[in-house]
Amino acid sequence: MDPMDIVGKSKEDASLPKATMTKIIKEMLPPDVRVARDAQDLLIECCVEFINLVSSESNDVCNKEDKRTIAPEHVLKALQVLGFGEYIEEVYAAYEQHKYETMQDTQRSVKWNPGAQMTEEEAAAEQQRMFAEARARMNGGVSVPQPEHPETDQRSPQS
């Protein structure tokens, strides 16, 4: 595959983070095994090629189903088509774990962000309160009253 075949990106753009890949490589091997820099680079290239292969096949599966977005099911089917069926169970388990962790993160962020559960009116009132605080800070701590509906305020400007 030509490096420029990857959606107009150069070879450098279509790579994986070296530090992360080096860490993964070291974690997968016994502690007494060292990997030469050239071998690490080759492994990274192989990983990029594998990702491109699975992505391309997933896209083909997606297109055959007249879909516009590649779904996890398309990736699993692509693995089967490419002869990597023995990995499907492990990949699916990793996908389920990812979904679970993402759901946990979302629930935690909602718990720590009470604004996410405000009604539109409450959010607007909170926004106005924060604007008033900001105006007070900008005016040296002096609170400047603001009309509730500036577009209908008929007061004349003070000289």
Swiss-Prot record:
The keyword Chaperone does not apply. It is found in: Nucleus. Keywords: Nucleus, Transcription. SUPFAM superfamilies: Histone-fold. GO terms for molecular function: DNA-binding transcription factor activity; protein heterodimerization activity; transcription cis-regulatory region binding. Gene3D superfamilies: Histone, subunit A. Disulfide bonds: none annotated. Residues 148-159 have a biased composition (Basic and acidic residues). Residues 135-159 are annotated as: Disordered. GO terms for biological process: regulation of DNA-templated transcription. It comes from the Eukaryota. The keyword Nucleus applies. GO terms for cellular component: nucleus. It holds the Pfam family CBFD_NFYB_HMF. InterPro entries: CBFA_NFYB_domain, Dr1-like, Histone-fold. Belongs to the NC2 beta/DR1 family. This is Protein Dr1 homolog. It comes from Arabidopsis thaliana (Mouse-ear cress).
